[in-house]
Amino acid sequence: MDTIHIRGGRRLNGRIPVSGAKNAALPLMTAALLTDEPLRLTNMPRLADVRTLTKLLAELGGDVAIDRGEDADVMTIRVADIKSTTAPYEIVSQIRASFWVLGPLLARCHEAKVSLPGGCAIGARPVDLYIKGLQKMGAEIDLVEGYVLAKAPGGLKGAVIRSPIVSVGATHTLMMAAALAEGVTVLENAAREPEIGDVANCLVAMGAKIEGIGTSTLRIEGVDRLHGATHRVIADRIEAGTYAVAAAMTGGEVVLEGVEAETFEAALSVLRAAGAGVESEQGAVRIFRNGERLQATDVVTQVFPGFPTDLQAQFMALMTTAEGESEITETIFENRFMHVQELARFGANISLHGDKALVHGVEKLKGAPVMASDLRASAALIIAGLAAEGETTINRVYHLDRGFERIEAKLSACGAEIWREKAK
């Protein structure tokens, strides 16, 4: 496995182009299953998860062409004929988002066999909401030997579906399924994340009829067929937030290009409260620090527009050297504090109390050998390594490649001393 090395203590200064959002790109790829015409996606990030989902689409009968650009790719997907409605364990176990093929396959083919999902090991993350929603739309579903077997012989029917909790995955799945269902589907308590809106806008470009985009109530009037379209993937607010934290922790000044501040305003608000400077302009955000020590700031993860759980680990790293004690509360996923013991190897002082972590700020961190436990924890360890004195070695960085594109190159361009040692 590859290893990342960092010599810390350097300020970041420069400009970082923010890649297309992983959490929009993946469901957009699955939306290509809803039509037999080409779906052209621009601003596609180059990520391991994208490559894995590409394999699954090919397994189902899709043709995927990629045009390499300087900073992003253009992906054209055409699924003229679905050759298989089975998403095998070997692929789905690698990436949770591959489970999202369930809705499009069921809507277009009236049947699907999809393995229960994999991805980062952060709690149970059950798929009950997906299944119950599809059942309300008339699907017959059984769980057999680790697979979801779904059938809708007469096609899916519109329904009013109220989710007991906000679920991004369930909203994606049910919205895509409803686009080809008979009648009107209303999704109440739907997720409002920008990535949901991005997928909805793409579906509209493909001919879907969706009202309430950006709100917690989506009204989808099913149509007989969808057509091809060209759609630009929105910027990755989690990547932007990660680099914003890195800039604040190391000092200096970084301009994040191609991202709108409102998509990650909750994170920027916490940065301001901690003492970092934040200035936004059209299509860019500038992060800077005047050299004074950051102040401890409490964080509670929430669904959008609240503070995102996918930035919790990065902000914990930031708080390890802030002045005072901060309380970080994780309300979205269980078991998402696996990075705590690795941050402690840098000299961080963190104690766990159920769903809360108390971070007692220390004067400085010291470089250490550490191991990544999941995607976002990997980013937190890189941030800590950038600020720490001495050299840091991060193992198991395959997690990182699932969600961050060219992270070493982007940080190096801003003055970081960071490099990758390829596995022998």
UniProtKB/Swiss-Prot annotation:
GO CC term (a single one): cytoplasm
Disulfide bonds: none
Keyword Iron-sulfur listed: no
Catalytic activity of the protein: phosphoenolpyruvate + UDP-N-acetyl-alpha-D-glucosamine = UDP-N-acetyl-3-O-(1-carboxyvinyl)-alpha-D-glucosamine + phosphate
UniProt modified residues of type 2-(S-cysteinyl)pyruvic acid O-phosphothioketal: C120
Enzyme class: transferase
Example GO biological process: cell division
Keyword Transferase: yes
Protein name in the entry: UDP-N-acetylglucosamine 1-carboxyvinyltransferase
Native organism: Parvibaculum lavamentivorans (strain DS-1 / DSM 13023 / NCIMB 13966)
Gene name linked to the record: murA
